[in-house]
């Protein structure tokens, strides 16, 4: 949409000599400004919101009402690399859902859920909530503010901050204004922020704290498209041109007529880009995954239905938002699915992954919850530590209850009529454990983004907590396969979402092949990367995932590894690393991380880390072993309580026990080339700050290979002589 007088308003230009908007006296009543905006934006002040009229901007415009399922001027191509491009949607005869936009999805939600609580946030130790009407109105105000700052069509608003209502307002407002939502991980370096912000042509960057603002100020000179920065959690340290608080953004947006925003909304089509998700990029720069409005609205509806997420008419889902919204799984689950079904989304503290998450879970009591495998593993380790410190009787009761329940869930997983002993175990012990975790009302617990060990899945089954897997990529808008209470098989990633398709190519004798996907979930293309897009999407429009898997007779998918992770030894043997790594961790409960090595080598070797406690302030691995690891040491005759004692002094008892455990794994291997012949224990567990784990705690294998190159080379030195 053209900017300037034709639209009935003018844009603010990026001008360092421009008077700062804070020089004008703010009108507290109209903005709802609070004195405590160092803690949270006054946009979510309860008293201010209660005065808002929900009538403004809620009438669906004629163009939106008249928009048919067929798209005007739909392009022939199934992919594009242009931010302003359009694609042909993968419409199927057996999936008749008409394509619709994010605004249409929100508008339809208002009709059903307008008065329900949409977002919950903590303020001064008290939970406050806003309704879907209020949510929608604020998003419109933010959209008008972005337009006033000069947001151009098919340019981005980048968001650099922890999960919060303002993150949601900014994301939805961006789409309403015709922009593209681009999340940036809070852990990103200034250089990473610069690359993403430049690549997506960010006109506006939204940050939460002064720390994140400093990153942007360092790189602003290298961002030719950037016109303004908006900060919401903390005030700027001083007055700066083109840096605004969220309240000032809202005030600026008042100059933009509602009709101007409606005109932009009316022109939006489902096959246009509205979200960019940047992959972590283990090699080279991250790729910008372009997602269309149809990708978002279709997945929010059907991907969640496959996971048995309920519409609020049946039961309002309550979820806790804490995983990075820059990741597609969290963004789809928390933000877009929430709007689709009228869920109540409650925001955890920024330090949730450092130990406070369980406090939020207890207070909110979610009905469904999602965590990456590492989060579930940390919960498991915490339960094991508490159990180890409990009295003899309580510990034995827990072990008995978990043993009885696990056996029941393994032998009769779908039997609702539990034996008396199972019901007694749940009543006396397990229900209390779930309540202590905040899962008393949680009916669906999901995981994704990385493989989960069999040990972790069996542990939670013993607590009567089924972990439902989903499988997909950023390139498939998240879930393409889903598990649910009615669609579950242990160790599988579920079945294909209705309306989507899957095929396995280049299958081996065991039926394992590369997983290829088709459907409304498939992305538009990689921004500005035609070669990479053509590598991912073939001539028939199938997405080649690079993941290996097999399908059973009932259509359940089992992931066996990644093509790029597949180890091809010097002898030509193809070795998937994940099953061997999981076997080692299952055999040796002292092991935290295991990474198999051997690509183009004569034999396999392995790097190991030990289970250690995390610093409560930084979430960094410490030198102290967990209670479970200490118990392991005691069982094998060691008095060690720290990693340095074991590695630095080469504790004979522990090293011998690990050697014997690996020998047991080797004994169960399919053939000798699958044997682990050498291994080493590292002095520090893998972590995000150490570079071995990505933002969702997925193992970054290439980084590990480079970081520990000297140790790895030492395994094979004898072979070179």
Swiss-Prot record:
Its EC number is 6.2.1.3. Mainly expressed in brain. Also expressed in adrenal gland and testis. In brain, it is present in cerebral cortical and cerebellar neurons and in steroidogenic cells of the adrenal gland, testis and ovary (at protein level). Residues 1-64 are annotated as: Disordered. SUPFAM superfamilies: Acetyl-CoA synthetase-like. GO terms for molecular function: ATP binding; long-chain fatty acid-CoA ligase activity; very long-chain fatty acid-CoA ligase activity. It catalyses: a long-chain fatty acid + ATP + CoA = a long-chain fatty acyl-CoA + AMP + diphosphate; (E)-hexadec-2-enoate + ATP + CoA = (2E)-hexadecenoyl-CoA + AMP + diphosphate; hexadecanoate + ATP + CoA = hexadecanoyl-CoA + AMP + diphosphate. Keywords: ATP-binding, Cell membrane, Cytoplasm, Cytoplasmic vesicle, Endoplasmic reticulum, Fatty acid metabolism, Ligase, Lipid metabolism, Membrane, Microsome, Nucleotide-binding, Phosphoprotein. Changing residue 287 to M: Abolishes enzyme activity. GO terms for biological process: long-chain fatty acid metabolic process; response to glucocorticoid; very long-chain fatty acid metabolic process. The modification Phosphoserine is found at residues 34, 50, 53, 70. It is found in: Cytoplasm; Cytoplasmic vesicle; Microsome; Endoplasmic reticulum. Belongs to the ATP-dependent AMP-binding enzyme family. Bubblegum subfamily. PANTHER family: ACYL-COA SYNTHETASE BUBBLEGUM FAMILY MEMBER 1 (PTHR43272:SF93), LONG-CHAIN-FATTY-ACID--COA LIGASE (PTHR43272). Catalyzes the conversion of fatty acids such as long-chain and very long-chain fatty acids to their active form acyl-CoAs for both synthesis of cellular lipids, and degradation via beta-oxidation. Can activate diverse saturated, monosaturated and polyunsaturated fatty acids. This is Long-chain-fatty-acid--CoA ligase ACSBG1. The lineage of its organism: Eukaryota, Metazoa, Chordata, Craniata, Vertebrata. The gene is Acsbg1.
């Amino acid at each position: 949409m053209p900017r300037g007088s034709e639209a009935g308003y003018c844009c603010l230009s990026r001008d360092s000599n421009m008077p700062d908007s804070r020089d004008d006296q703010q009108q507290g009543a109209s903005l709802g400004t609070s004195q405590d905006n160092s803690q949270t934006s006054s946009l979510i002040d309860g008293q201010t919101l209660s005065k808002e009229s929900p009538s403004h901007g809620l009438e669906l415009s004629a163009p939106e009402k008249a928009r048919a399922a067929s798209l005007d001027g739909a392009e022939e191509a199934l992919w594009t690399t242009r931010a302003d491009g359009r694609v042909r949607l993968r419409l199927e005869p057996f999936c008749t859902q008409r394509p619709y936009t994010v605004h249409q999805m929100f508008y339809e939600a208002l009709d059903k859920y307008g008065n329900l609580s949409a977002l919950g946030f903590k303020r001064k130790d008290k939970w406050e909530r806003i309704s879907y009407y209020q949510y929608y109105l604020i998003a419109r105000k933010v959209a008008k503010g972005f337009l006033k700052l000069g947001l151009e069509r098919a340019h981005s608003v980048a968001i650099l901050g922890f999960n919060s209502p303002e993150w949601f307002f900014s994301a939805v407002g961006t789409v309403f204004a015709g922009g593209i939502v681009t999340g940036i991980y809070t852990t990103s370096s200034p250089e990473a922020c610069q690359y993403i912000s430049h690549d997506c042509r960010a006109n506006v960057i939204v940050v939460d704290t002064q720390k994140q603002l400093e990153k942007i100020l360092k790189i602003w000179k290298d961002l030719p498209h950037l016109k303004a920065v908006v900060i919401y959690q903390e005030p700027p340290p001083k007055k700066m041109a083109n840096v605004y608080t969220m309240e000032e953004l809202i005030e600026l947006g008042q100059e933009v007529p509602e009709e101007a925003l409606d005109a932009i909304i009316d022109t939006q089509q489902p096959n246009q880009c509205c979200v960019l998700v940047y992959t972590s990029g283990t090699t080279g720069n991250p790729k910008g995954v372009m997602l269309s409005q149809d990708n978002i609205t279709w997945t929010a509806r059907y991907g969640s239905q496959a996971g048995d997420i309920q519409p609020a008419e049946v039961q309002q889902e309550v979820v806790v938002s804490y995983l990075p919204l820059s990741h597609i799984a969290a963004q789809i689950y928390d933000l877009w699915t929430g709007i689709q079904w009228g869920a109540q989304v409650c925001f955890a503290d920024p330090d949730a992954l450092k130990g406070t998450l369980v406090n939020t879970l207890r207070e909110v009591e979610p009905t469904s919850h999602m965590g990456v495998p590492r989060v579930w593993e940390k919960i498991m380790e915490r339960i094991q530590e508490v159990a180890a410190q409990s009295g003899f009787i309580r510990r034995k009761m827990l072990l008995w209850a978990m043993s009885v329940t696990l056996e029941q869930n393994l032998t009769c997983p779908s039997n609702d009529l539990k034996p008396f002993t199972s019901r007694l175990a749940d009543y006396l012990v397990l229900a209390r454990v779930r309540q202590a975790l905040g899962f008393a009302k949680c009916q669906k617990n999901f995981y994704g983004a990385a493989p989960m060990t069999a040990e972790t899945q069996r542990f939670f089954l013993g607590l009567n907590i089924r972990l439902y897997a989903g499988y997909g990529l950023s390139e498939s808008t998240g879930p393409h396969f889903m598990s649910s209470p009615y669609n579950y098989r242990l160790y599988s990633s579920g079945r294909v979402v209705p309306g989507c398709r899957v095929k396995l190519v280049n299958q081996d004798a065991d039926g394992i092949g590369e997983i290829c996907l088709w459907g409304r979930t498939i992305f538009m293309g990689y921004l500005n990367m035609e070669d990479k897009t053509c590598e991912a999407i073939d001539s028939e429009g199938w997405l080649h995932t690079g993941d290996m898997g097999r399908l059973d007779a009932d259509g359940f998918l089992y992931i066996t590894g990644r093509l790029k992770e597949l180890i091809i030894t010097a002898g030509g043997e193809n070795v998937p690393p994940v099953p061997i790594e999981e076997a080692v961790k299952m055999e040796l409960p002292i092991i935290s991380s295991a990474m198999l090595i051997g690509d183009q080598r004569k034999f396999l070797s392995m790097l190991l880390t030990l289970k250690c406690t995390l610093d409560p302030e930084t979430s960094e691995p410490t030198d102290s072993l967990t209670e479970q690891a200490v118990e392991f040491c005691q069982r094998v005759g060691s008095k060690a309580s720290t990693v340095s004692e074991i590695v630095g002094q080469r504790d004979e008892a522990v090293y011998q026990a690990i050697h014997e455990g690996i020998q047991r794994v080797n004994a169960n291997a399919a053939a000798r080339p699958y044997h682990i012949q050498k291994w080493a224990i590292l002095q520090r567990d893998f972590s995000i700050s150490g570079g071995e784990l990505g933002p969702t705690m997925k193992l970054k294998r290439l980084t590990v290979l480079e970081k520990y190159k000297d140790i790895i080379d030492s395994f094979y030195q004898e072979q070179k002589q």
